[in-house]
Every structure is written in structure tokens, then in C-alpha cells.
């Protein structure tokens, strides 16, 4: 069986886009397991400007018409249909070209799995609600109906998918995560500070940044040694700058986009990682920090709440609330101050990633998902 991951972009792990990171990791692990896997990317830039990788990659030009399918991609799909058993794995949702791809796959009798990566969670659907409602009825409903399985990364997505169409065949399965190697930072931060961190795209509607800044400000006014490191960039950078003014002067540091060892070196110096998203598929940044032994504060909307509770590696907020965040930070700060032997949450954090997000344990479930798609 051949597995084709089809995405917008190039599956470049050195981008802030979480879908790129997930697809890169999944394809890498499948290749290492001896599976016949490739990534096909639709992009306006056909340059191979990404790090060396183990799996095959083909890039196809994006068309000016968002529904347009490049002739080269149409031909590649025809060749795939005649080359034996194959499953196409689509990543993302509300992508016009996927409607065209789905129609072509149906005509070629090629099964496909769709992973929306958080796009069908209730909070995500509320953004541009009217436009999405119209688009869903005209185009997205076809994509969903024809999917052999809709692969959900978290429970919030299952709820969203069932609200769109309760008859759809869903599969709930997280992706795995390969823990990064700890990095000694080039310029270690001064000791004695309680460092809270965030890493991701600066998009308030998605990431709940107003809550993050307000909750931290409330906390920091009572804990003068607190700092907030914000790693990333995005459309709400100016708003984050403004919201940071509510915190004590100098306590919020906007570090911009960081990648590779530089990012890992920063994450490893944190005492808490905070992720107050309104919706997610499964946020890679949280797993990166937790794998380094950093406790976390997450909202239920991250789809990580059950894991954090089960492994005891942080705090879970029912919703993105500044008051709830401040209270959670106070509890974690109290543990940090106590420094009682055996009280560190770091072992629990590492155990969560090594157990619940272990690729060798999850890959058979992905294979079963593809076999079900072939049999559908």
C-alpha cells in the first residue's frame, strides 16, 4: 500500500505552521517503519528550500483559481490510481483545491482520509461563521461525505465533525511526537526568575493571546520575579505588544520566531509553558516543552487536557480565562518555590510524551486507519 500525504506547503518543520510539523513527523516515522510513503505539496514556490528529509517529496504548483488543479497533479493522481493499492491522506480543511481533488479521487476510485487539524472544532467554526456555513454546504460537505475516514486528533474535533454531519465515519487518534534533545543555551538566562513561556503563531482568535497576557499580568503584579517569554510572530504582534503593557515593565519579552536548537534552548529554560488556545488539533509546541520536562497550563480546547490530568504534569483550564490562568500559575509557582525533593513535575512531563505520544505504539493504528479506508 502506498501512502500519499497531500498538503498545502512543503511539510517544512522549520515553520510556525503546526500542520507542516505534524506531516513531516508522520511521514518520517512511516518511512522509518518501512512503509511506502511520500508527501505531495501544493505551493506557489516550487523551490526545495527545506531541510534534508528521509521521505520522497513532490511539489505541484498552486493555481491562481483556488479550486484549480495543476495538470501535473492531475496526472500524478491518475498514475497513482494505476499503480496498486494506495490511500491519499489530506491535511487541512476549508481548502478550495481539496474539493477538486476529492472529485478527482472519487472518479479514480482512490480512497482518502481527511485530517482537519482543528479546523472543525466548534470554536474554529465560529470564525467567519457565515462564510464557512455557505462554503460547507456548497463544497466542504462533499469532501467530508466522500472521505473514507475523518481523522480527528482530539475530542473537540469529533464534536465539531458530528455537528456538521453525524453520519460521518470518524477516527480519534493523536499523532506521535519524537522528543527533542535538550540544548544548552548559548546565553543562559539569569537564575532566580519564574519563567512562563508561549510558542506559536500570534493569532489571538486561535491562540487566546489576550487571555495569556491578561492572566500573566494579574499573576506578575503579585509575583515580581515572573517573566513571560513569547516565541513566535503573526498578525496580532502589535496587539500583543499593547496587551503586554498591562504587565509589570520588562516582564514580557517578545522574542520573535525561533527555530531548531535556538527554540529548544529557550523552551528548556522555562518553568511553565502556557497555551490558552480557543481551539486546536493537537499543539506541537506544548509537546515540545513538556518533552523537555516543563510543566504546562493548557485549556481543554487544546485536546491535551485529559493527558495532562492523567499524567499529572500541569494544570488544565476549563476555558481561556485570565483569572483561571493566574490561579494556575500561582499553584505552579508555589511548587517551584517549595523545591521539595521528589516534587518536580518534570518526570511526569517526560513520561506523558514517551507513553501517550510514542510513535512506535501509534503507527499500527495509522496503518489500521488506512486499511479501513481501502476497505470502505
For the regions a protein language model found, what residue spans apply to each?
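Conserved donor-binding/catalytic core segment of Leloir-type glycosyltransferases
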Residues: 4, 188-207, 213-217, 229
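N-terminal strand-loop element at the rim of the active site
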Residues: 7-16, 22-68, 160, 236, ...
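Membrane-proximal helix-turn-helix segments that form the acceptor-binding/catalytic region
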Residues: 107, 132-150
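Carbohydrate-associated surface elements
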Residues: 156, 176
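Nucleotide-activated donor-binding/catalytic signature segment of Leloir-type glycosyltransferases, i.e.
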Residues: 240-258
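Aromatic "clamp/platform" in nucleotide-sugar-dependent glycosyltransferases that forms part
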Residues: 278
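Short hydrophobic beta-strand element within catalytic cores of glycosyltransferases
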Residues: 295-299
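Conserved acidic donor-binding segment of nucleotide-sugar-dependent glycosyltransferases
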Residues: 310, 315-323, 331-337
Amino acid at each position: 500500500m502506498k501512502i500519499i500525504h497531500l498538503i498545502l506547503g512543503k511539510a517544512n518543520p522549520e515553520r510556525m505552521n503546526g500542520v507542516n510539523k505534524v506531516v513531516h513527523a508522520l511521514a518520517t516515522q512511516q518511512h522509518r517503519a518501512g512503509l511506502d510513503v511520500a508527501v505531495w505539496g501544493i505551493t506557489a514556490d516550487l523551490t526545495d528550500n527545506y531541510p534534508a528529509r528521509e521521505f520522497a517529496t513532490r511539489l505541484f504548483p498552486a493555481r491562481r483559481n483556488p479550486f484549480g488543479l495543476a495538470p501535473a497533479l492531475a496526472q500524478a493522481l491518475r498514475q497513482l490510481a494505476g499503480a496498486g493499492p494506495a490511500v491519499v491522506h489530506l491535511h487541512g480543511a476549508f481548502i478550495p483545491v481539496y474539493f477538486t481533488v476529492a472529485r478527482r479521487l472519487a472518479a479514480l476510485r482512490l480512497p482518502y482520509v481527511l485530517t482537519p487539524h482543528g479546523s472543525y472544532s466548534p470554536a474554529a467554526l465560529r470564525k467567519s461563521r457565515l462564510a464557512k456555513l455557505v462554503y460547507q454546504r456548497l463544497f466542504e460537505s462533499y469532501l467530508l461525505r466522500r472521505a473514507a475516514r475523518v481523522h480527528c486528533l482530539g475530542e473537540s474535533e469529533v464534536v465539531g465533525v458530528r455537528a456538521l454531519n453525524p453520519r460521518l465515519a470518524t477516527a480519534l487518534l493523536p499523532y506521535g511526537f519524537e522528543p527533542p534533545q535538550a540544548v544548552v543555551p548559548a546565553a543562559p538566562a539569569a537564575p532566580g526568575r519564574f519563567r512562563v513561556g508561549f510558542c506559536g503563531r500570534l493569532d489571538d482568535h486561535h491562540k487566546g493571546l489576550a487571555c495569556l497576557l491578561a492572566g500573566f499580568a494579574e499573576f506578575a503584579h503579585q509575583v515580581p520575579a515572573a517573566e513571560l517569554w513569547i516565541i513566535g510572530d503573526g498578525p496580532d504582534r502589535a496587539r500583543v505588544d499593547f496587551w503586554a503593557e498591562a504587565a509589570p515593565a520588562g516582564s514580557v519579552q517578545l522574542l520573535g520566531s525561533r527555530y531548531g536548537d535556538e527554540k529548544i534552548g529557550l523552551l528548556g529554560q522555562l518553568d511553565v509553558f502556557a497555551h490558552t488556545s480557543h481551539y486546536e488539533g493537537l499543539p506541537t509546541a506544548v509537546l515540545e516543552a513538556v518533552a523537555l520536562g516543563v510543566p504546562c497550563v493548557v485549556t481543554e480546547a487544546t485536546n491535551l487536557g485529559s493527558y495532562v490530568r492523567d499524567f499529572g504534569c500541569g494544570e488544565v483550564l476549563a476555558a481561556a480565562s485570565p483569572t483561571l490562568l493566574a490561579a494556575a500559575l500561582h499553584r505552579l509557582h508555589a511548587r517551584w518555590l517549595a523545591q521539595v525533593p521528589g516534587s518536580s513535575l518534570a518526570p511526569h512531563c517526560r513520561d506523558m510524551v514517551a507513553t501517550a505520544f510514542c510513535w512506535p505504539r501509534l503507527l499500527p493504528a495509522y496503518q489500521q486507519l488506512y486499511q479501513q479506508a481501502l476497505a470502505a
